[in-house]
Amino acid sequence: MNKLIDFSKGLVPVILQHAQTDSVLMLGYMNEEAYQKTLKEKKVTFFSRSKQRLWTKGETSGHFQHVESIHLDCDQDAILIKVMPQGPTCHTGSLSCFNSEIESRFKIQALAQTIHQSAKANQSNSYTQYLLKEGIEKISKKFGEEAFEVVIGAIKHNREEVINETADVMYHLFVLLHSLDIPFSEVEQVLAHRHQKRNNFKGERKEVREW
């Protein structure tokens, strides 16, 4: 395929796409050397325009992008690489770098980013910082309390209460994940893997590991 790509015109844009979920992960650029290195090592390497050198994605964080397949567009001037990410793609801890939509609805990844930012900010009135300073036992207790509130609302068939308490559960879940240094992208990867499975009936004794 490299014979079809004309690198003489400059850097070629490269889109990374999750091989299982088809989510668009990030945009980078390659010169011929970066492309050849990617082919050889099966890990995505870009040419960094800011550093002016080859840059293997994950070389610092360990969050490598493992190549599954490579595709060329019809004009032969852009590349799509389907990858299996080894951890989050974005430096913010998100699975994808494309999270800042214009006039978009709220998405769950934004909650993880907000908690990540709140944890780093120096705000004395931050509830997120309060929970993190109190530690995992406090966070786990709050998570359990909010989950129980969902159960109570469900038993009462109180739709509004279930919705509101579920939002509280999600917030405390993400604080818990942050406190344990677990990026939500790892949860997404497990969900994506299980989504590929079918007819995983639990039965009477078998523990649920796949849906």
From Swiss-Prot:
Cell compartments where the protein resides: Cytoplasm
Region called Phosphoribosyl-ATP pyrophosphohydrolase, residue ranges: 108-211
Molecular function terms from GO: ATP binding; phosphoribosyl-AMP cyclohydrolase activity; phosphoribosyl-ATP diphosphatase activity
Pfam families: PRA-CH, PRA-PH
NCBIfam families per record: histidine_hisI (TIGR03188), PRK00051.1 (NF000768), PRK02759.1 (NF002747)
Pathway membership, UniProt: Amino-acid biosynthesis; L-histidine biosynthesis; L-histidine from 5-phospho-alpha-D-ribose 1-diphosphate: step 2/9; Amino-acid biosynthesis; L-histidine biosynthesis; L-histidine from 5-phospho-alpha-D-ribose 1-diphosphate: step 3/9
Gene3D superfamilies named in the record: MazG-like (1.10.287.1080), Phosphoribosyl-AMP cyclohydrolase (3.10.20.810)
Protein name stated in the entry: Histidine biosynthesis bifunctional protein HisIE
Record has Hydrolase as a keyword: yes
Region annotation (Phosphoribosyl-AMP cyclohydrolase) ranges: 1-107
CDD domains tied to this protein: NTP-PPase_HisIE_like
Gene Ontology biological process terms from the UniProt entry: L-histidine biosynthetic process
Keywords from the named record: Amino-acid biosynthesis, ATP-binding, Cytoplasm, Histidine biosynthesis, Hydrolase, Multifunctional enzyme, Nucleotide-binding
Domain of life, source organism: Bacteria
The keyword ATP-binding belongs to this UniProt entry's keyword annotation: yes
Family matches, as InterPro entries: His_synth_HisIE, HisE, PRib-ATP_PPHydrolase-like, PRib_AMP_CycHydrolase_dom, PRib_AMP_CycHydrolase_sf
GO annotation, cellular component aspect: cytoplasm
Family that this chain belongs to: In the N-terminal section; belongs to the PRA-CH family. In the C-terminal section; belongs to the PRA-PH family.
Catalyzed reactions per annotation: 1-(5-phospho-beta-D-ribosyl)-ATP + H2O = 1-(5-phospho-beta-D-ribosyl)-5'-AMP + diphosphate + H(+); 1-(5-phospho-beta-D-ribosyl)-5'-AMP + H2O = 1-(5-phospho-beta-D-ribosyl)-5-[(5-phospho-beta-D-ribosylamino)methylideneamino]imidazole-4-carboxamide
Entry EC no(s): 3.5.4.19, 3.6.1.31
